[in-house]
Every structure is written in structure tokens, then in C-alpha cells.
């Protein structure tokens, strides 16, 4: 008699596809387009790449969904989806780790050294490289501005985005963004519980609330950027403070937008096609994992770019 350990399960092997290669080229276009769009030369490339990415993913996901609904998935294939999503989220963690590492280095190593701490002396570092340098974060003046004044291209902001400079906490957008995002983490969990109870109506309701909160966050983020540019003078030309601020918050905001679209896709599948059961709902689970990851990551940008400021090094 053949033992249970030797019983082989059927494994569905998809047909060969060029979709991964097309997606890779589309993502490459997005990267080059975004880099060149800063100088005003890559906007068209960026939009072409974004359209190609969205179209490719939509087509790819539709194929996977059809295969799942046709019963072609096996436990082995489902495990490969789980591991694939886990590695994808891990790679995203490494992205954020690199950006936070850069900000940590600037704030905790570079600025104190320029201020006279560490192996470099103030006379060698600060006085030669930047005579008017003040070892505080965020720097409100750029090296070019200290030399050229109003003729400088890169200028520090008139005000910063940190909590201590806010006069009215009720209008402080990062606070509302935090409330919105943490609330959405709770609502997506409630939706998951409803799905496990096979309550589709409640699942659709709470998932819809989560999607709405996701796009509210994106809108509030856009309003905050407008306020930074129009009223605070904080732009990408505001030196290291401007670049790190917009890199971290913008990169996170992009992930919120992607996560919102991901959740919206699951809502449409459930509401329009009655996809998902209390036992089989990995598409939603993957979206919820990604969303919880986005929520947790937000704590770091809001702490470093909105709460902790003006760390002064005494000379």
C-alpha cells in the first residue's frame, strides 16, 4: 500500500506567458519617467509606463482570477501565492528601510559631525564647507542660499511641517491622516471577520468603508503637499529637508494609492461577481496584508517628518 507521504496532488501549470516581461518593461518606464519628470522631460514616459503597469496588472489578475474560479488552484499553488506575497511585502520593507536609513544618517550622523561632533572638527567640516551652518533639524536654509541669498535656486522653507510649529492642532493634516489610516486598518479587519462568518453584506460594507478611507488619505496628502508648496515654501528645491520629506511621504502615499486600488478590486469582485467564500479568499487576504503593512509603515514617516524636530548639537 502506498503511504500518505507518497500521494501526489495534481499541480496546475499555467501556460507560458509574456506578461511578466511586459510588466518589467512597464515598471522600467515608470522608473525612468519619474526620474526624468523632475526635470520636466519624462512626463510622457511616466504616463505611458503607468498606463502599461495598470493595464498589465489588470490583465494578469483577471487571468489568475479566472483560473481560481475554474477550480484550477491547488494547495501547492496557493502556498506559492502566499510565499510570493510575503516576499513582495518584505521587498517593500527594504525599500522603506533604505529611505529611513538615509534620513537617519543625515539627522544623527551628518548633522552632528558638521556641528563639531565625531572625528571631524568644526573648523574642517562646518567652517570650510558651510560657514553659516546650524546643527539643527530640519535645516531652514540651504548652502547655496547662505552664499547667494535670494538669488539662490535652492532655498529653505519659510516654515516646517513639524508639530511644534502648528498653531491649530485641529487643522494639522498629518493628525487626520493618521486617524484615517489607523481607522482603515480596523475596518479592513472587521471586513475580514465578516467574510470568515460568510456575511457578504457586512463584508462589502466594511471593505467599502476601507476603500473610502484609503482615497480620503490620498486626498488629504495632496492637500498637505499643496499647503507645503503654496504656503510653507517647502518644495523639492528646499535642500535635504525637502527631498527627504517628499521622498518618504510621497513613496508611502503611492503605496496607499496602490493599496486602495488593490482593495477596490476585491470589493468589485465580491459585490459584482460574488467571489470569495469563508474558506477561499486569498485575493482579499493578500490585499489586507498589504494594507496592514502600509498602515504600520506610516508610523515611521509621520514620526520622523512631522513629530521629531529641531535636534540641536551644542558646539
Which sequence ranges carry the predicted segments?
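Hydrophobic residues within alpha-helical transmembrane segments
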Residues: 208, 212, 250, 290-293
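Final/C-terminal transmembrane alpha-helix of multipass membrane proteins
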Residues: 288-304
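Alpha-helical transmembrane segments
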Residues: 45-53, 248-257
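Conserved small/polar residues in nucleotide/adenosyl-binding loops
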Residues: 305-314
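Membrane-interfacial helix termini and the short, flexible loops that connect transmembrane helices
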Residues: 1-86, 90-93, 97-171, 175, ...
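Alpha-helical transmembrane segments of multipass membrane proteins
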Residues: 95, 213-217
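Active-site His/Glu-centered metal-binding helix of metallohydrolases
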Residues: 94, 179, 223, 254-257, ...
Amino acid at each position: 500500500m502506498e503511504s500518505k507521504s507518497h500521494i501526489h496532488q495534481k499541480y496546475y501549470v499555467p501556460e507560458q506567458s509574456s506578461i511578466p516581461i511586459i510588466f518589467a518593461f512597464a515598471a522600467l518606464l515608470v522608473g525612468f519617467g519619474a526620474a526624468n519628470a523632475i526635470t520636466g522631460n519624462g512626463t510622457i514616459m511616466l504616463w505611458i509606463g503607468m498606463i502599461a503597469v495598470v493595464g498589465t496588472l489588470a490583465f494578469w489578475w483577471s487571468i489568475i482570477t479566472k483560473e481560481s474560479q475554474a477550480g484550477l488552484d491547488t494547495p501547492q499553488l496557493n502556498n506559492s501565492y502566499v510565499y510570493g506575497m510575503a516576499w513582495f511585502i518584505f521587498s517593500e520593507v527594504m525599500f522603506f528601510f533604505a529611505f529611513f536609513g538615509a534620513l537617519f544618517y543625515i539627522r544623527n550622523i551628518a548633522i552632528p559631525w558638521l556641528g563639531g561632533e565625531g572625528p571631524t572638527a568644526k573648523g574642517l567640516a562646518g567652517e570650510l564647507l558651510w560657514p553659516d551652518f546650524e546643527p539643527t533639524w530640519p535645516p531652514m536654509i540651504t548652502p547655496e542660499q547662505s552664499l547667494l541669498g535670494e538669488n539662490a535656486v535652492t532655498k529653505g522653507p519659510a516654515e516646517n511641517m513639524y508639530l511644534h510649529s502648528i498653531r491649530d492642532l485641529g487643522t494639522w493634516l498629518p493628525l487626520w491622516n493618521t486617524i484615517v489610516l489607523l481607522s482603515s486598518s480596523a475596518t479592513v479587519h472587521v471586513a475580514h471577520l465578516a467574510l470568515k462568518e460568510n456575511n457578504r453584506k457586512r463584508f462589502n460594507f466594511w471593505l467599502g468603508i476601507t476603500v473610502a478611507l484609503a482615497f480620503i488619505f490620498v486626498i488629504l496628502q495632496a492637500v498637505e503637499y499643496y499647503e507645503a508648496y503654496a504656503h510653507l515654501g517647502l518644495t523639492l528645491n528646499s535642500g535635504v529637508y525637502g527631498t527627504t520629506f517628499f521622498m518618504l511621504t510621497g513613496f508611502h502615499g503611492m503605496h496607499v494609492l496602490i493599496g486602495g486600488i488593490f482593495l477596490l478590486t476585491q470589493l468589485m469582485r465580491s459585490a459584482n461577481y460574488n467571489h470569495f467564500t469563508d474558506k477561499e479568499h486569498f485575493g482579499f487576504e493578500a490585499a489586507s496584508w498589504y494594507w496592514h503593512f502600509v498602515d504600520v509603515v506610516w508610523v515611521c514617516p509621520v514620526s520622523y517628518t512631522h513629530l521629531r524636530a529641531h535636534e540641536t548639537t551644542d558646539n
